[in-house]
């Protein structure tokens, strides 16, 4: 019996996509359940550098998509809507942008979108925005998430001295995020590795991490159980 760390599996999918060793690297896992940065010395040795204080990025995408009256899953729906919007139409907050903490927060951003849609009295039932307003809100929200993630990746690359960023999780399929991280890595002289979209969400390639444990003779006891919040 071999236990596989779901989060480590997302980074390992980058190794399979690259077809070569990618370690050591900075790992960013950005999904509906996780938003965290890791120092990855090898496939099985990961040190948490920082995570989110509240919502994960993917969770924020889903919640804001609901506020805007878009479909589920929220990530793809919001990305499609943002494609025709102005990312500078609304100045939404980027948490922790003025300090070096490798932490994320998306709850305040979500609330800012809510107030931009409905004003301060959000208890009243009002229809979701439509047309250009909705597209601009989606684009401005997406830009804020991308900026926050890219900034902390740049800070983490400088902090660790690593020259490779591996990114996994469903949100990493977002084209705007890929472009933002590519620009950040170029400025830092670092290599960016992101799997194709089909390997960003949960997939069987992640379970291939079990091969690394098998090679090392690392097996789990028969009473192994799932740990939903394990990082």
Language model: regions and residue ranges:
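A contiguous, well-structured pocket-lining segment that forms one wall/lid of small-molecule binding clefts
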Residues: 80-165, 175-188, 215-218
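Conserved phosphate-binding/catalytic loops in two-lobed NTP-binding clefts
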Residues: 3, 165, 181-207
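Conserved phosphate-binding catalytic cores of ATP/NTP-utilizing and phosphoryl-transfer enzymes
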Residues: 4-26, 210
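Glycine-rich phosphate-binding loop plus the immediately following alpha-helix
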Residues: 5-8, 19, 42-86, 110-120
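Glycine-rich phosphate-binding/hydrolytic loop that grips phosphoryl groups
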Residues: 10-13, 195-231
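Short beta-strand scaffold segments in enzyme catalytic cores
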Residues: 12, 27-29, 35-39
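Glycine-rich beta-strand-to-loop/alpha-helix junction loops that act as flexible
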Residues: 31, 165-174
């Amino acid at each position: 019996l071999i236990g596989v760390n779901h989060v480590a599996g997302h980074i390992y999918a980058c190794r399979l996509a690259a077809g070569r060793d990618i370690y050591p690297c900075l790992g960013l896992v950005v999904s509906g359940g996780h938003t965290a940065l890791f120092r990855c010395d090898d496939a099985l040795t990961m040190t948490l550098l920082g995570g989110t204080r509240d919502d994960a990025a993917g969770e924020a995408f889903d919640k804001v998509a609901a506020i805007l009256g878009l479909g589920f899953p929220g990530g793809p729906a919001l990305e499609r809507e943002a494609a025709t919007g102005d990312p500078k139409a609304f100045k939404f907050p980027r948490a922790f942008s003025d300090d070096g903490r490798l932490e994320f927060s998306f709850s305040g951003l979500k609330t800012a979108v809510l107030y931009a849609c409905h004003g301060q009295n959000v208890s009243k039932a009002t229809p979701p925005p439509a047309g250009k307003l909705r597209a601009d809100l989606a684009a401005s929200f997406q830009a804020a998430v991308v900026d926050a993630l890219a900034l902390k990746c740049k800070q983490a690359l400088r902090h660790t001295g690593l020259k490779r960023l591996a990114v996994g999780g469903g949100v990493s399929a977002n084209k705007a995020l890929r472009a933002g991280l590519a620009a950040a890595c170029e400025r830092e002289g670092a290599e960016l590795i992101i799997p194709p979209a089909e390997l960003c969400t949960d997939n069987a390639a992640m379970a291939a991490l079990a091969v690394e444990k098998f090679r090392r003779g690392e097996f789990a006891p028969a009473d192994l159980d799932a740990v939903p919040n394990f990082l």
